[in-house]
Amino acid sequence: MSDRWYVGVDVGGTTIKMAFLTTAGEIVDKWEIPTNKQDGGALITTNIADALDKRLSGHHKSKSDLIGIGLGAPGFIEMDTGFIYHAVNIGWRDFPLKDKLEEETKLPVIVDNDANIAALGEMWKGAGDGAKNMLLITLGTGVGGGIVANGNILHGVNGMAGEIGHITVIPEGGAPCNCGKTGCLETVASATGIARIATEGVTEHKESQLALDYDKHGVLTAKDVFSAADASDAFALSVVDHIAYYLGFAIANLANALNPEKIVIGGGVSKAGDTLLKPIKQHFEAYALPRVADGAEFRIATLGNDAGVIGGGWLVKQQENSMEKGNETE
């Protein structure tokens, strides 16, 4: 095994997660720095480079001990060039992220979407367990995802593949989505969507635990819904089944097209575990082709906040392997 390390970087709206990884994907060290949004995020690459230098010195290592940087970022990305067209939460617009970071660090940089690198991380070292055909669905404030086919992330013609949260599941009369459409999966299966559905129904279920929670706190959360469902509250169980129906329906349609080996559910909402997973699987099996359903295994994501940095390491590994194969054919 090489003594040199991969660098994984996961850029978020409030923090940037960073890690050194062995070539086997084990985290040697991990840390966070604040996301500096001043001047439209112009100083982020400098902050990353400075943080790398500082951390390297603590390990008595130098840049020559690093193989490259794999970075996940939000927003619309030109995958080949690492150019960020627009990342609302960061402030980047028409930002040459790959070029700037390579200039600052003097290391090769590979850039991909943050949801995609989380999928790669789970595939490599997490719930995907090495599966070369896998779906990752992240349920948090929004609904995101990544599609791994034959060991590679599907990007599509302009980087938009994997926008699972914007599959239309309610064609008419659905709630408005942040994307501008209505009835997207995100409007029902995100933490905010789950809370909205529960809140809209409490007036008709005044004896439920959720109605008591709402009267007490004036607000409901997805966590409240799953806690009440775990306590066998009938209304909460009906809300969970409602959102699981749409998730199972959407995932089945994806699976019928992609035939995945693993379907991994991640994000904060996935902490509900089997309370959510069991009804999703029931509805999935109702809409998936039997052979597709037989080949797919549902799993809860295991890497948590480490998925992105581990996936960043995989990007470097993948590029390193392709370069070695290229040299062999010359």
Swiss-Prot record:
| UniProt catalytic activity | D-glucose + ATP = D-glucose 6-phosphate + ADP + H(+)
Enumerate the InterPro entries for this protein: ATPase_NBD (IPR043129), ROK (IPR000600), ROK_cs (IPR049874), ROK_glcA (IPR004654)
Q: Where does the signal peptide begin and end?
A: none
PROSITE patterns reported for this sequence:
ROK
Q: Which domain of life is it from?
A: Bacteria
What EC numbers are recorded for this enzyme?
A: 2.7.1.2
Transmembrane stretches in the record are: none
Record's protein name: Glucokinase
What is the phylogenetic placement of the source species in the record? Bacteria, Bacillati, Bacillota, Bacilli, Bacillales
